[in-house]
Amino acid sequence: MLDERYRTLLEARSRRPQTIAEAAARRVRPSSLFNEHGRLMMIAADHPARGALRAGERALAMADRTELLDRLSLALSRPGVNGVLGTPDILEDLLLLGALENKVVVGSMNRGGLAGTVFEIDDRFTAYDAASLAAAGFEGGKMLLRIDPDDPSTVATVEACGRAVSELAAHRLLAMVEP
């Protein structure tokens, strides 16, 4: 059975989707990208969007949405953890749960290259774009850049990543490129 926090979250998403933008506008942003030790310690929460649900020995560790959100909220509350990287659905849920206050928030941008598919390297930007990250008041965007010298789709992904870095820079946002 869902606890009250998740019933409220589902109600907001289904009946009042504008509350996501309202919560983003109210969110207290961090004063720096770095924690008190001069480091950026982020929790990565963009793996489920590619169907990667394993954590350790648990093949479906990230399959239960409420358990995942509980674990992410707990991790974000730990000393020294000052940020999260995630897809729109995860970040919006964490935002509605109040877990992103004073946290560095980086949105995942390209999630189209699903593992094991013929279009895996043709990794389209199917999540955030720079304008939506700026509108949400998030600190940056992250993209995955995989190079396959035998796949002609690589060049389109390289070009799209370059364009995304420029668009993030135009909005004065952090760009993270994962090799």
Go through the PLM ranges and name each one.
Residues 169-179:
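Histidine/lysine/aspartate-rich catalytic loop segments that bind and position anionic ligands
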Residues 1-124:
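Alpha/beta catalytic barrel-like cores
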Residues 108-171:
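Hydrophobic alpha-helical segments and helix pairs
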